[in-house]
Amino acid sequence: MSAQSLLHSVFSCSSPASGGTASAKGFSKRKLRQTRSLDPALIGGCGSEMGAEGGLRGSTVSRLHSPQLLAEGLGSRLASSPRSQHLRATRFQTPRPLCSSFSTPSTPQEKSPSGSFHFDYEVPLSRSGLKKSMAWDLPSVLAGSGSASSRSPASILSSSGGGPNGIFSSPRRWLQQRKFQPPPNSRSHPYVVWRSEGDFTWNSMSGRSVRLRSVPIQSLSELERARLQEVAFYQLQQDCDLGCQITIPKDGQKRKKSLRKKLDSLGKEKNKDKEFIPQAFGMPLSQVIANDRAYKLKQDLQREEQKDASSDFVSSLLPFGNKKQNKELSSSNSSLSSTSETPNESTSPNTPEPAPRARRRGAMSVDSITDLDDNQSRLLEALQLSLPAEAQSKKEKARDKKLSLNPIYRQVPRLVDSCCQHLEKHGLQTVGIFRVGSSKKRVRQLREEFDRGVDVCLEEEHSVHDVAALLKEFLRDMPDPLLTRELYTAFINTLLLEPEEQLGTLQLLIYLLPPCNCDTLHRLLQFLSIVARHADDNVSKDGQEVTGNKMTSLNLATIFGPNLLHKQKSSDKEYSVQSSARAEESTAIIAVVQKMIENYEALFMVPPDLQNEVLISLLETDPDVVDYLLRRKASQSSSPDILQTEVSFSMGGRHSSTDSNKASSGDISPYDNNSPVLSERSLLAMQEDRARGGSEKLYKVPEQYTLVGHLSSPKSKSRESSPGPRLGKEMSEEPFNIWGTWHSTLKSGSKDPGMTGSYGDIFESSSLRPRPCSLSQGNLSLNWPRCQGSPTGLDSGTQVIRRTQTAATVEQCSVHLPVSRVCSTPHIQDGSRGTRRPAASSDPFLSLNSTEDLAEGKEDVAWLQSQARPVYQRPQESGKDDRRPPPPYPGSGKPATTSAQLPLEPPLWRLQRHEEGSETAVEGGQQASGEHQTRPKKLSSAYSLSASEQDKQNLGEASWLDWQRERWQIWELLSTDNPDALPETLV
């Protein structure tokens, strides 16, 4: 038999039928049953034996053992065949690389540039090429350890492809092997590298510094809280000698019920003949929260259906109204609010929330933060990030990959929050609250209403003692106590430690609790602390004596201690035998709960050292996650070393059009829904590199001074990524402003930049050289008469920003042009700037236009020629009162800067001074200062002084005339006389 026929029989999809096929198939089935649960090495050995027997049978080999036939039976013949060598060489010359460690003596070694790379390739699904490509790609899908370079093709094929558990007989096993392979090392993070400095400060390569501070545990993301559990568990084992075994508590829903509990619950259901399934009492805490959320979603859905039914007529008249409403709805960042936070809230019919969008957990998962766009991430969030109870059923290895990067809502049951709110409002002055008896009938009625899932509104007519008894009964009936049975001994043994160590140990034990237990415990301790503060009698503001409730922290701990921390309930006989021991434990429980009530605020704060450990743990596995978390911490901090915030939204409460599908750093609300994508973060990091390299001191722009819209173009993005030292150099070639981006879309030949802003708040031209307090996306509109002598006015905390100005990142831009005003005049508000500028300049890119008000004029460049005279040659124009600059108008007539104050002002831009025109410029600047005092809503004449001289030099240039004409047309387009031309988001 020739080598060609053998290859055909091996790699074809169907083997030729022969008399021995049935016996081979039967034998293979028996072997498959025998070796299904054996070790892979035994399976490979069995397969090799079968391959040897199959080689003796020749062409009658079955499809299951055909690779062993090639490997064992006829390996020498195929190796000696020239045609087979040619075919094998052509196979290995395919562009799809194999594993870097695989090599055979008969084929040249092919190694990837990095030995740690693992390549995953899709298998072609053609009929003729499926098994061929599979056979030659087997080395790339092997999951076994060891060096593959020392293994022959026969052993490789027999261990992976020919055995009964190989990929040909078990595709599911092959997929699992591919699934558990290490992921491709294609994720590189060269754009930002964070490192810890040892004093809880993290620095990036871009120069950004973040100092960790104590934060509430609720402000941490879901992933951080999961890692915090591990860090606290490690510290408890290493540093705290509690004399007991410590385990991280599992979620109550995952714990199996004992047989006795099952029988007891079955008997109770039969005796009571309930017509409904309990929704609150006697259920795991996570399930109670899931039921509350499901009921809230059902209510929201019914409310939306009712609204849709009432608005069918309007929708039929306006077919696009519904689409527009949904679009606006999805573009806003809706904050997640738990049903337990606002139990009595009613959703406004004017602002509906889509149920799947508004009630998911957190933001994006870890495994999709770098390789999904926004549309895919929305789908991922809706599918993977479902209820907290469902997330616990995942494997522990894949747990972190499904956790959110943003803080999740408070997981507090609706019943607990409703009772606490009612008692805080009506029961703080009730003497003996939680001790006075209640009506069992009314308490049972309230319990049934909550168990049915009814949205119970606890009003003033409800008795305070009934509500207090309901709260105690809920905590007592929980199948697992709030402080969990796993940590029962650990909590009690904290009293054996030194007093200064007890609080820190209690803090670590609280970190071990599941998020639902931790949040519910925080809400309960907060309420009990408020009750304890009203225990003593005091005098009100009116001078009347207010009686206290007499419930001190000790009394409250005596009541709630056994409900929060207890062992599994035992029989009466066991209780009588161990009564003395239980009494001692009860005293310890009361002492522990009392300490927690008195120090609840400190217990739920996460110190910087633990945050640092969490970030170090995440840095080893997910550096991109650490980058996102640290940038969010930086944006939320109020330190002046942060350049800008990462999110922009309007002052009026309406979100920007970029907020729906761009990065959000979590500073809109702690329950933000969006997470960044890798491409955006890399651009942001490059922008930070540029900004930090060029300015000596960085400033933070408050969120309330952020522009609504943005401008986007490839040219502006390329400028954003340019290096920082350019900020101190000549900037006529590469201006860092938005007007240059606009002009690049109109005329690519001109390089003269301008400025954009919000509603015309352009106070200076971006053609001026950058100042120490300038930002990369646009200069702050400053009231310079107020900060004339202080170059660090921004840093000192006295914000002199008059109007909103853009400080948002360029990568978070919308596709439309949302600039509301474009002003070609550098609206410098005092004469001091005019005095700093010479009367004539030879730099064509420092041109300042001679326009006192472009909003009213309708002439073209000829009008500019008629106005090209200095101010001192046109004294009659100083009294004009028919023109006003575009808003924002200059300041309220404070004294302008005089020439005596000029040495105090820093050099704000590069100038080419001329000796012959300096004195004239000073005189004109002083005259402009006087006019600014008398007419605060007029433009200063200092612009006309320097700009008119510049006009005389540039009027002969055709390109400059075209540039002025384009500026004039854009200003007319966006003037107040034509408000319809403004973008929708800025009207």
Curated annotation (Swiss-Prot):
UniProt subcellular location: Cytoplasm
Entry's Gene Ontology molecular function annotations: GTPase activator activity; SH3 domain binding
Gly residues bias (residue ranges): 44-57
SMART domains xref list: RhoGAP
Span(s) of short sequence motif SH3-binding: 344-354
Renumbered residue ranges of the record's region Disordered: 1-60, 76-117, 144-170, 324-363, 641-676, 709-731, 825-847, 863-953
GO cellular component: actin cytoskeleton; cytosol; mitotic spindle
Protein name: Rho GTPase-activating protein 6
Compositionally biased region (Low complexity): 144-159, 328-350, 939-948
Task of the protein: GTPase activator for the Rho-type GTPases by converting them to an inactive GDP-bound state. Could regulate the interactions of signaling molecules with the actin cytoskeleton. Promotes continuous elongation of cytoplasmic processes during cell motility and simultaneous retraction of the cell body changing the cell morphology.
PANTHER family membership: RHO GTPASE-ACTIVATING PROTEIN 6, RHO-GTPASE-ACTIVATING PROTEIN 6 FAMILY MEMBER
Tissue: Expressed in retina and lung.
Modified residue annotations for Phosphoserine: S37, S265, S365, S669, S675, S682, S713, S758, S776, S781, S790, S824, S941, S944
Keywords for this protein: Cytoplasm, GTPase activation, Phosphoprotein, SH3-binding
Domain Rho-GAP positions: 403-604
GO biological process, one term: focal adhesion assembly
Positions with biased composition (Polar residues): 1-21, 100-115, 658-676
Superkingdom of the source species: Eukaryota
Site (Arginine finger): R435
